Amino acid sequence: ELVDSVSKGGNLLLNVGPRGDDAQIPTPQLDRLKAMGAWLRDNGEAVYGTRPWSFAEARTDDGAPVRFTTRGDRLNVIPLTAVGGGELVVRGVALSGLGVRLSDGCPVELRAEGDATRMIFARPQTGAFAPAVAIDGGAAATP
C-alpha cells in the first residue's frame, strides 16, 4: 500500500493504536510495522522525497504490479513481488539502461523489448519482497 500510494503522489496513513488495557501495540500491527521498517531501511530511497513518474504503474509478465517513483534524474522501478530467479519482464513500458537494486547494490541491466522491459539481475534476489531498482540519469523510456 505504501509504494502504491507514493507512486501516485499520495501518502499512507497508519492507524496504529495501543490496547486500552496495557497500552501495548497489538502483535499483528507491530509485526507489520517492523516488516515495513525493514523494507524501508533497504529501499527507502525509492520512497522518501520522491514524486510520481510519467507512468504510475505497470505489470510483470505474470501479472504482478510494478510501481515507479522518481527523484531528480533517478527513476525507481518497484515490482510489488519477490523476483524469483535473475530476470523480470515489465509490460507496458520499455526502459533501457543500467540500474542497481537498492537493497544490496546488485547491478541490473534493463533491456527494451518492444513495449516491455527485461530486467536482468546480476545476482538472484535473496528473500526481499518488492526489490526497488534505481536507474540514475540514463533510463530511456518508450511508452
List the predicted regions and their residue ranges.
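Mature catalytic domains of secreted/periplasmic carbohydrate-active enzymes
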Residues: 1-143
